[in-house]
Amino acid sequence: MSDNQQNLRLTARVGYEAHFSWSYLKPQYWGIWLGIFFLLLLAFVPFRLRDKLTGKLGIWIGHKAKKQRTRAQTNLQYCFPHWTEQQREQVIDKMFAVVAQVMFGIGEIAIRSKKHLQKRSEFIGLEHIEQAKAEGKNIILMVPHGWAIDASGIILHTQGMPMTSMYNPHRNPLVDWLWTITRQRFGGKMHARQNGIKPFLSHVRKGEMGYYLPDEDFGAEQSVFVDFFGTYKATLPGLNKMAKLSKAVVIPMFPRYNAETGKYEMEIHPAMNLSDDPEQSARAMNEEIESFVTPAPEQYVWILQLLRTRKDGEDLYD
C-alpha cells in the first residue's frame, strides 16, 4: 500500500489531511513556488485592475486551449440548441474571462483576512440557511460547478459556517497540500472521494454543512438519464437518500464572480422538496442547476465532460 493510500484510509473519519514535506523545496517544485509567489502578490492588487488584465488574458487563453474550448462548444450546442454559434462563442469568451479572474484572484482568498473576504462577498437568500439552522436542521448545500466554487466555500467559513466536502487529491503533492490548507484555513473538513461518502455524511450529521457538487458524469451504472437544459444527462439520483441518511435538508446554492462589483456572489434557494423517486429527485436537481445557470451561463464550468455518457454510447467529445 502506498503512503498516499494509507493516508487516505487513516483520515477517512477525521477528514483528508495533506502534510507538508521538506521535499517540496526541491528544484522540481520551484516553478510552482514561483507561481504561488506571483498569486500572493496579486492578492494585494486592486481588483478592478487585476480583473481587467486577467479577463483579457483569459479570453486569449480560451482561444489557445483548443480541447477545453471544444468541450464547451459541444456542451453549449446540446444544452442550448436554439442559440446561434455567435451566442455560444460569446458565452465561452466570457467564461474564460471569469476563469482567469477567479484563478488569478485565489491568492486573495488564500491569505486575506476574514473581514476583507466578507467585504468582497454578497449573499442572496442567506435567510434560507439561517432558517434551517434556527430549526436545528442539518444542511447539505447542493452546489453546481461554478468557477467560484472554491472561493465561495472558503467565504462561507468566514460567516461561521463550517463546511465538509469531498475532494479528489491532486496528483502533484505540493499543489495538493496548498489547496488543502487553503480550503481548510477557516475550519471544516475535506474528505477524499476514495473513502466513499460515509465520512462526508457523518460530518453532516455532526452539524457541519455539507458542500455537495452534483453535476459530474459518473457513468450509466450510477446514474439515471433525465432532462438537462435542451438535452439529457446521466445524473446521480441519490440526493434524497443522502439527505435522509444525514437527516439534512438540501439547499441549492450557486457561486458567481461579479467582475463589475468585484464580489463573490452566493445565490441561495429555498430547501428542496425531494421525491423518493430517483428520476424525479435527479430532475429536480437539474432544474435547480438550470435556474442558476441560465441567467449567467458564463459562470458555469462548461469545459467538463458533462454529457460524456449517452444512451446510444456515442462519444460527443471524441
Curated annotation (Swiss-Prot):
One of its GO terms (molecular function) is acyltransferase activity, transferring groups other than amino-acyl groups. It is an enzyme of class 2 (transferase). It catalyses: an alpha-Kdo-(2->4)-alpha-Kdo-(2->6)-(acyl)-lipid IVA + a fatty acyl-[ACP] = an alpha-Kdo-(2->4)-alpha-Kdo-(2->6)-lipid A + holo-[ACP]. Pathway: Glycolipid biosynthesis; KDO(2)-lipid A biosynthesis; KDO(2)-lipid A from CMP-3-deoxy-D-manno-octulosonate and lipid IV(A): step 4/4; Bacterial outer membrane biogenesis; lipopolysaccharide biosynthesis. GO terms for biological process: glycolipid biosynthetic process; Kdo2-lipid A biosynthetic process; lipopolysaccharide biosynthetic process. One of its GO terms (cellular component) is membrane. Its main location: membrane. A motif (HXXXXD motif) lies at residues 145-150. It is found in: Cell inner membrane. It comes from the Bacteria. Keywords: Acyltransferase, Cell inner membrane, Cell membrane, Lipopolysaccharide biosynthesis, Membrane, Transferase, Transmembrane, Transmembrane helix. The chain crosses the membrane at residues 27-47. InterPro entries: LipA_acyltrans, Lipid_A_MsbB. It is a single-pass membrane protein. Its EC number is 2.3.1.243. The keyword Acyltransferase applies. Catalyzes the transfer of an acyl chain from an acyl-[acyl-carrier-protein] (ACP) to a Kdo(2)-(acyl)-lipid IV(A) to form a Kdo(2)-lipid A. PANTHER family: LIPID A BIOSYNTHESIS LAUROYL ACYLTRANSFERASE, LIPID A BIOSYNTHESIS MYRISTOYLTRANSFERASE. This is Lipid A biosynthesis acyltransferase.
